[in-house]
Curated annotation (Swiss-Prot):
This is Arginine repressor. It is found in: Cytoplasm. It comes from Mannheimia succiniciproducens (strain KCTC 0769BP / MBEL55E). GO terms for biological process: L-arginine biosynthetic process; protein complex oligomerization; regulation of arginine biosynthetic process. The lineage of its organism: Bacteria, Pseudomonadati, Pseudomonadota, Gammaproteobacteria, Pasteurellales. It holds the Pfam family Arg_repressor_C. One of its GO terms (molecular function) is DNA-binding transcription factor activity. The keyword Repressor applies.
Amino acid sequence: MAIEKTDNLLTVFKDLLSQERFGSQSEIVSALQDLGFSNINQSKVSRMLTKFGAIRTRNTRMEMVYCLPNELSVPNTSSPLKNLVLDIDHNDFLIVIKTSPGAAQLIARLLDSVGKTEGILGTIAGDDTIFITPTKGTGIKELINTIQQLFENSL
């Protein structure tokens, strides 16, 4: 039951931050207490803000508020891999895939495992960017279509 309550707290906490209307930790504490989390205090809120990488930024009304930037979220094993891919672009020689931070090496490893049979000669991955080189005789557009199908079907 305690784990269920903690999971619920974390879900509610993230939902509150997504509203982008809380400018102080005390406002977050009050909102959580109003929602029935009586054991919440400023130090717990501070730890949760740190855990989720929350930042203070200006919302659309130019108010300083806490928020959770989605693009900074860390990939986990329950994340569908296609949701980690932000953009696929190319030139005449390479395909470049932009991913969520920290996801590039995971996705590149999967693409390397598919390998030459699907037209991938090799990949180079950083933190959030993958360079893909096609095999000789494989067109860039053809390889992009293959990669997109892989993300839709099996990843």
